[in-house]
Amino acid sequence: MPGSASYAILFLGTLLEALVVVCAIKRKVLRRYFVLNLYMVLCLAVSWGRHYVLARDGFGSLNYRYFYFYSDALLTIVLYFSLISLYLSVFEEMRVGRYLRLGALTLLAGTSWFTYAVVSQSSHKILTYFAFELSQNLYFVGLVLTYVLWAAVLKMRQTPTLLVQLVLSLGVYFSFFAACYALSNLHPTLYARVSIFFPVVGCLLPLSWAYAFWRVPNDARLSPARLAMAGVPR
Protein backbone atom coordinates (compact mmCIF):
# COMPACT_ATOMS: atom_id res chain seq x y z
CA MET A 1 0.00 0.00 0.00
CA PRO A 2 2.43 2.62 -1.19
CA GLY A 3 2.13 6.37 -1.30
CA SER A 4 -0.33 8.58 0.45
CA ALA A 5 -2.73 5.70 1.14
CA SER A 6 -0.17 4.13 3.51
CA TYR A 7 0.19 7.35 5.47
CA ALA A 8 -3.58 7.84 5.63
CA ILE A 9 -4.27 4.33 6.94
CA LEU A 10 -1.42 4.48 9.46
CA PHE A 11 -2.59 7.88 10.69
CA LEU A 12 -6.19 6.67 11.01
CA GLY A 13 -5.06 3.61 12.93
CA THR A 14 -3.01 5.79 15.28
CA LEU A 15 -6.02 8.01 16.02
CA LEU A 16 -8.26 5.01 16.71
CA GLU A 17 -5.69 3.41 19.03
CA ALA A 18 -5.46 6.63 21.04
CA LEU A 19 -9.26 6.84 21.06
CA VAL A 20 -9.53 3.41 22.71
CA VAL A 21 -7.41 4.51 25.66
CA VAL A 22 -9.27 7.82 25.95
CA CYS A 23 -12.64 6.04 25.97
CA ALA A 24 -11.41 3.52 28.55
CA ILE A 25 -10.25 6.32 30.84
CA LYS A 26 -13.48 8.24 30.31
CA ARG A 27 -15.64 5.22 31.19
CA LYS A 28 -13.34 4.21 34.07
CA VAL A 29 -12.53 0.72 32.74
CA LEU A 30 -8.81 1.27 32.22
CA ARG A 31 -7.79 -0.87 35.19
CA ARG A 32 -10.32 -3.62 34.55
CA TYR A 33 -9.11 -4.05 30.97
CA PHE A 34 -5.55 -2.95 31.60
CA VAL A 35 -3.84 -5.45 29.27
CA LEU A 36 -6.12 -4.51 26.37
CA ASN A 37 -5.30 -0.85 26.89
CA LEU A 38 -1.60 -1.66 27.26
CA TYR A 39 -1.83 -3.35 23.88
CA MET A 40 -3.34 -0.20 22.40
CA VAL A 41 -0.63 1.98 23.94
CA LEU A 42 2.02 -0.28 22.41
CA CYS A 43 0.16 -0.15 19.10
CA LEU A 44 0.27 3.62 19.35
CA ALA A 45 4.04 3.59 19.96
CA VAL A 46 4.62 1.12 17.13
CA SER A 47 2.44 3.18 14.79
CA TRP A 48 4.55 6.26 15.44
CA GLY A 49 7.67 4.17 14.91
CA ARG A 50 6.33 2.91 11.61
CA HIS A 51 5.43 6.47 10.62
CA TYR A 52 9.02 7.50 11.27
CA VAL A 53 10.66 4.58 9.44
CA LEU A 54 8.21 4.86 6.55
CA ALA A 55 8.90 8.58 6.12
CA ARG A 56 12.66 8.10 6.41
CA ASP A 57 13.27 4.92 4.41
CA GLY A 58 10.14 4.30 2.35
CA PHE A 59 7.56 1.52 2.24
CA GLY A 60 9.68 -0.95 0.29
CA SER A 61 12.86 -0.54 2.36
CA LEU A 62 14.43 -3.38 4.34
CA ASN A 63 14.44 -1.24 7.48
CA TYR A 64 10.68 -0.81 7.29
CA ARG A 65 10.16 -4.52 6.71
CA TYR A 66 12.39 -5.49 9.65
CA PHE A 67 10.71 -2.97 11.92
CA TYR A 68 7.29 -4.16 10.78
CA PHE A 69 7.91 -7.87 11.40
CA TYR A 70 9.66 -7.44 14.75
CA SER A 71 7.08 -4.99 16.07
CA ASP A 72 4.26 -7.18 14.76
CA ALA A 73 5.65 -10.15 16.70
CA LEU A 74 5.77 -8.05 19.87
CA LEU A 75 2.22 -6.78 19.38
CA THR A 76 0.91 -10.28 18.66
CA ILE A 77 2.39 -11.55 21.93
CA VAL A 78 0.76 -8.71 23.87
CA LEU A 79 -2.53 -9.32 22.04
CA TYR A 80 -2.26 -12.97 23.08
CA PHE A 81 -2.01 -11.89 26.72
CA SER A 82 -4.93 -9.50 26.14
CA LEU A 83 -6.99 -12.53 25.18
CA ILE A 84 -5.80 -14.35 28.30
CA SER A 85 -6.90 -11.36 30.39
CA LEU A 86 -10.41 -11.82 28.98
CA TYR A 87 -10.23 -15.47 30.08
CA LEU A 88 -9.39 -14.23 33.57
CA SER A 89 -12.40 -11.90 33.51
CA VAL A 90 -14.79 -14.63 32.34
CA PHE A 91 -13.60 -17.17 34.91
CA GLU A 92 -12.99 -14.65 37.69
CA GLU A 93 -15.52 -16.21 40.07
CA MET A 94 -14.02 -19.69 39.66
CA ARG A 95 -10.66 -18.54 41.06
CA VAL A 96 -8.60 -20.34 38.44
CA GLY A 97 -6.45 -17.36 37.50
CA ARG A 98 -3.23 -19.04 38.62
CA TYR A 99 -3.84 -22.04 36.39
CA LEU A 100 -4.87 -19.88 33.44
CA ARG A 101 -1.68 -17.82 33.69
CA LEU A 102 0.47 -20.95 33.94
CA GLY A 103 -1.33 -22.50 30.99
CA ALA A 104 -0.96 -19.32 28.94
CA LEU A 105 2.79 -19.15 29.58
CA THR A 106 3.20 -22.84 28.80
CA LEU A 107 1.25 -22.50 25.56
CA LEU A 108 3.27 -19.45 24.52
CA ALA A 109 6.53 -21.24 25.31
CA GLY A 110 5.40 -24.29 23.37
CA THR A 111 4.38 -22.19 20.38
CA SER A 112 7.72 -20.37 20.45
CA TRP A 113 9.65 -23.64 20.66
CA PHE A 114 7.67 -25.13 17.78
CA THR A 115 8.26 -22.01 15.70
CA TYR A 116 11.99 -22.07 16.41
CA ALA A 117 12.18 -25.77 15.56
CA VAL A 118 10.66 -25.02 12.16
CA VAL A 119 12.70 -21.92 11.29
CA SER A 120 16.00 -23.30 12.62
CA GLN A 121 16.19 -25.47 9.52
CA SER A 122 16.74 -22.27 7.55
CA SER A 123 19.93 -20.32 8.19
CA HIS A 124 18.80 -17.30 6.15
CA LYS A 125 17.79 -14.40 8.41
CA ILE A 126 16.56 -16.78 11.10
CA LEU A 127 15.58 -14.04 13.58
CA THR A 128 13.35 -12.22 11.09
CA TYR A 129 11.86 -15.51 9.92
CA PHE A 130 11.20 -16.51 13.55
CA ALA A 131 9.39 -13.22 14.26
CA PHE A 132 7.25 -13.64 11.15
CA GLU A 133 6.38 -17.29 11.83
CA LEU A 134 5.71 -16.67 15.52
CA SER A 135 3.16 -14.00 14.63
CA GLN A 136 1.43 -16.39 12.24
CA ASN A 137 1.32 -19.23 14.75
CA LEU A 138 0.02 -17.00 17.53
CA TYR A 139 -2.80 -15.83 15.30
CA PHE A 140 -3.87 -19.46 14.82
CA VAL A 141 -3.54 -20.13 18.55
CA GLY A 142 -5.47 -16.95 19.32
CA LEU A 143 -8.21 -17.96 16.91
CA VAL A 144 -8.71 -21.31 18.63
CA LEU A 145 -8.58 -19.79 22.12
CA THR A 146 -11.07 -17.08 21.21
CA TYR A 147 -13.67 -19.55 20.00
CA VAL A 148 -13.07 -21.77 23.04
CA LEU A 149 -13.67 -18.69 25.20
CA TRP A 150 -16.79 -17.83 23.24
CA ALA A 151 -18.10 -21.37 23.75
CA ALA A 152 -17.57 -20.92 27.49
CA VAL A 153 -19.32 -17.54 27.41
CA LEU A 154 -22.34 -19.13 25.73
CA LYS A 155 -22.67 -21.51 28.68
CA MET A 156 -22.94 -18.69 31.19
CA ARG A 157 -26.22 -17.32 32.45
CA GLN A 158 -25.16 -13.69 32.45
CA THR A 159 -22.06 -11.98 31.09
CA PRO A 160 -21.11 -8.28 30.94
CA THR A 161 -22.13 -6.96 27.54
CA LEU A 162 -18.83 -5.12 27.21
CA LEU A 163 -16.92 -8.37 27.68
CA VAL A 164 -19.02 -10.06 25.00
CA GLN A 165 -18.29 -7.23 22.57
CA LEU A 166 -14.55 -7.47 23.22
CA VAL A 167 -14.48 -11.25 22.74
CA LEU A 168 -16.47 -11.08 19.50
CA SER A 169 -14.25 -8.37 18.04
CA LEU A 170 -11.16 -10.41 18.85
CA GLY A 171 -12.74 -13.43 17.21
CA VAL A 172 -13.29 -11.54 13.97
CA TYR A 173 -9.78 -10.07 14.11
CA PHE A 174 -8.02 -13.38 14.70
CA SER A 175 -10.20 -15.09 12.09
CA PHE A 176 -9.22 -12.65 9.36
CA PHE A 177 -5.49 -12.82 9.96
CA ALA A 178 -5.47 -16.59 10.48
CA ALA A 179 -7.37 -17.05 7.22
CA CYS A 180 -5.00 -14.73 5.35
CA TYR A 181 -1.92 -16.52 6.68
CA ALA A 182 -3.45 -19.90 5.86
CA LEU A 183 -4.09 -18.79 2.27
CA SER A 184 -0.59 -17.38 1.94
CA ASN A 185 0.89 -20.65 3.20
CA LEU A 186 -1.06 -22.58 0.59
CA HIS A 187 -0.19 -20.07 -2.13
CA PRO A 188 2.86 -17.95 -1.11
CA THR A 189 2.30 -15.57 -4.01
CA LEU A 190 -0.96 -14.44 -2.39
CA TYR A 191 0.77 -12.89 0.64
CA ALA A 192 1.72 -9.72 -1.22
CA ARG A 193 -1.92 -9.28 -2.22
CA VAL A 194 -3.66 -10.06 1.07
CA SER A 195 -1.14 -8.09 3.14
CA ILE A 196 -2.42 -4.94 1.46
CA PHE A 197 -5.54 -5.24 3.61
CA PHE A 198 -3.69 -5.75 6.91
CA PRO A 199 -3.51 -2.03 7.85
CA VAL A 200 -7.17 -1.55 6.93
CA VAL A 201 -8.37 -4.48 9.03
CA GLY A 202 -5.97 -3.38 11.75
CA CYS A 203 -8.06 -0.23 12.12
CA LEU A 204 -11.23 -2.22 12.78
CA LEU A 205 -10.11 -3.70 16.11
CA PRO A 206 -9.44 -0.34 17.84
CA LEU A 207 -12.62 1.01 16.24
CA SER A 208 -14.71 -1.80 17.72
CA TRP A 209 -13.03 -1.50 21.13
CA ALA A 210 -13.45 2.27 21.21
CA TYR A 211 -17.14 1.85 20.34
CA ALA A 212 -17.57 -0.81 23.04
CA PHE A 213 -15.86 1.26 25.74
CA TRP A 214 -17.80 4.40 24.81
CA ARG A 215 -21.29 3.08 24.08
CA VAL A 216 -21.76 -0.05 26.20
CA PRO A 217 -22.75 0.71 29.83
CA ASN A 218 -20.42 -0.78 32.44
CA ASP A 219 -23.27 -2.51 34.28
CA ALA A 220 -25.01 -3.86 31.17
CA ARG A 221 -25.34 -7.64 31.14
CA LEU A 222 -26.87 -10.17 28.79
CA SER A 223 -27.53 -13.88 28.67
CA PRO A 224 -25.45 -15.49 25.90
CA ALA A 225 -27.07 -18.85 26.62
CA ARG A 226 -30.50 -17.43 25.76
CA LEU A 227 -29.12 -15.85 22.62
CA ALA A 228 -27.69 -19.20 21.56
CA MET A 229 -30.98 -20.97 22.24
CA ALA A 230 -32.88 -18.28 20.35
CA GLY A 231 -30.83 -19.04 17.25
CA VAL A 232 -31.66 -22.76 17.37
CA PRO A 233 -34.71 -23.65 15.23
CA ARG A 234 -37.46 -25.49 17.02
What are these model-predicted stretches?
Residues S4-E17, G58-L88, A104-L108, V194-P206:
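Individual alpha-helical transmembrane segments in multi-pass integral membrane proteins
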Residues L30, V46-Y68, S184-Y191:
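Helix-loop junctions on the outward
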Residues F59-Y70, K125-Q136, L162-L166, T189-P199:
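Non-cytosolic membrane-interface motifs at loop->transmembrane helix junctions
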Residues E17-K26, H51-F59, Y70-L102, W113-S123, ...:
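Internal transmembrane alpha-helix with an interfacial aromatic "cap," most often the third helix
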Residues V148-R234:
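C-terminal transmembrane-bundle signature of multipass membrane proteins
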Residues C23-V35, Y87-R101, L127-T128, L154-V164:
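Membrane-interface helix-boundary motifs at transmembrane edges
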Residues S6-Y7, S123-V148, M156, S195-F198:
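Extracellular-loop-to-transmembrane junctions of the mid-late helices
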Residues L38, L42-A45, D72-F81, L100-S120, ...:
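Alpha-helical transmembrane segments of multi-pass integral membrane proteins
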